[in-house]
Structures are given as C-alpha cells and as structure tokens.
From Swiss-Prot:
Belongs to the PsbZ family. The gene is psbZ. This is Photosystem II reaction center protein Z. The chain crosses the membrane at residues 8-28, 41-61. Keywords: Chloroplast, Membrane, Photosynthesis, Photosystem II, Plastid, Reaction center, Thylakoid, Transmembrane, Transmembrane helix. GO terms for biological process: photosynthesis; photosystem II stabilization. HAMAP family: PSII_PsbZ. It is found in: Plastid, Chloroplast thylakoid membrane. Coiled coil: none annotated. May control the interaction of photosystem II (PSII) cores with the light-harvesting antenna, regulates electron flow through the 2 photosystem reaction centers. PSII is a light-driven water plastoquinone oxidoreductase, using light energy to abstract electrons from H(2)O, generating a proton gradient subsequently used for ATP formation.
Length: 62
C-alpha cells in the first residue's frame, strides 16, 4: 500500500514539474496556445484527478 502511495506521489510531482515548466513555455510561444490548448486542459484535469486519487488513497494508508 505504501509503495502505491509513493508511486502516486512521484507521478504527481513529475506531472506538476512538467506543468510548471511547460505551461509558461506554451503561453509565451506565438501560436502555440491554439495548438496545445487541449493538451494543457487534459494535463490539468489529469493533475486534479491525481490529487484527488492520491488524497483518497492516503486516507486508507494512514
């Protein structure tokens, strides 16, 4: 159980880092927002879902 929680947290950290670096680059690049808008929204939705799943799973571990 703890290993799964550690894996979820690691994925959350990696996705957070990718979003922190990637979203500003997409917003600054000319014309990139129109092409990558769906990817940004999908990544943000995945991040939010991962936060909820990690929090729910954490309540079972501790």
């Amino acid at each position: 159980m703890v290993t799964i929680l550690q894996l979820l947290v690691s994925i959350l950290i990696l996705l957070s880092f990718a979003l922190v670096v990637g979203v500003p680059v997409i917003l600054v690049s000319p014309g990139e927002w129109e092409r990558s808008k769906n990817l940004v929204y999908a990544s943000a939705g995945l991040w939010f879902g991962l936060v909820i799943v990690t929090a729910a799973f954490n309540s079972f571990v501790i």
